[in-house]
Amino acid sequence: MQNLCYQLKVIPAFNSNIYRLLELDGSCTFAALSDLILDAFEFNHDHLYMFSLGRKPYDPNGIYSPGGRAEKRADRVRLQDVAPVKRNKYLYLYDFGDEWIFYLSLIHI
């Protein structure tokens, strides 16, 4: 299977005037995507996180950071595993205490 390149636009909920464009291979795990987002916004890598494919914080069907009890672990699920579709929107929640929320949009495959 050929790995496709995905372009994501990441907008922090705390400041919608800024964004980052990330390009990554479809074989990239959600754990690696978390690292890319944190690096792009200069955050430390010291809290738990989750991704929601339906933009719902604490989504029971979400993809959670490794080490928890979630069925879908971010270090095991790849971007291409969730059958991303152009213009799909996702939520990334970092730090369950401070709840830093980022909105992700798939803008190009």
Residue ranges with predicted function:
Residues 16-31:
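Short, contiguous acidic and Ser/Thr-rich linear segments
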Residues 60-88:
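Eukaryotic mixed-charge, acidic/polar low-complexity intrinsically disordered regions
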Residues 41-57:
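Short loop-to-beta-strand transition segments
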Residues 107-109:
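Conserved small/polar residues in nucleotide/adenosyl-binding loops
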Residues 2-20:
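Eukaryote-biased recognition of intrinsically disordered, low-complexity regulatory segments
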Residues 4-6, 84-91:
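Short, hydrophobic/aromatic-rich segments at coil-to-beta transitions
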Residues 97-103:
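Short coil-to-beta-strand transition motifs
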Residues 29-43:
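Short amphipathic, charge-patterned alpha-helical segments
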